[in-house]
Amino acid sequence: MGIKDWPEGEGPRDKLLQKGAGQLSDAELLAVLLRNGLAGLNAVDLARSLISEFGGLRNLLCAPRNQVCRLPGVGPVKYAQLQAAAELARRVAQENLQRGQVLTNPDLTRDYLMRQLADRSYEVFAVLLLDSQHRVIQFVELFRGTIDSASVYPREVVSLVLEKKAAAVIVCHNHPSGNAEPSQADRRITERLKNALATIDVSLLDHMVVGDREIVSFAERGWIN
């Protein structure tokens, strides 16, 4: 059954229009995007089955195309709709942290980094470049793949900082496993970066590790002095 076939006022789309998107469950929101179910399953049932199959929305949205499209009721069109919605969410977060904005709200930074990195199926190491008044200059993804003390090169971070004339930086990376607890390698990387940036009088304000539903801040733990 498709969304258009629901009795008037009972479908997830009608509920969204009447009560707002915040009142819909994950499955109902996903159903609005999917629009149609398949034989024996309406759109909400299909959405529930997809969320269950992948263990949550995050895993569904970052799953490879071949894994998603192999399931009944989900073809290339529905996959494209889901990816478009995920990318729109990331771009909204990007707009919320525009160039020139002063970082006075830690929650804004956390929300931005969560949206940028939490749904990646691979590790990303990135740098948030700030000026002397802690205004945003740029967010740059520097390294992808397995992030350890041997794969992050301080000289490349220093080169980027000099190029963009940044006065302070926040570095961050994600853990695709979902567990945001920093490793010993993460702590070694941080120490190396802090020392390298100190040689050009640039402050390392924080290193944030992004997990599935949380972010660990080195600064909050007192690991950056």
Swiss-Prot record:
One of its GO terms (molecular function) is metallopeptidase activity. Residues 102-224 form the MPN domain. CDD domains: MPN_DUF2466. The keyword DNA-binding does not apply. Zn(2+) binds at residues 173, 175, 186. One of its GO terms (biological process) is proteolysis. Keywords: Hydrolase, Metal-binding, Metalloprotease, Protease, Zinc. The keyword Disulfide bond does not apply. A motif (JAMM motif) lies at residues 173-186. It comes from the Bacteria. Gene3D superfamilies: Cytidine Deaminase, domain 2 (3.40.140.10). Belongs to the UPF0758 family. This is UPF0758 protein Shew185_0376. It comes from Shewanella baltica (strain OS185).
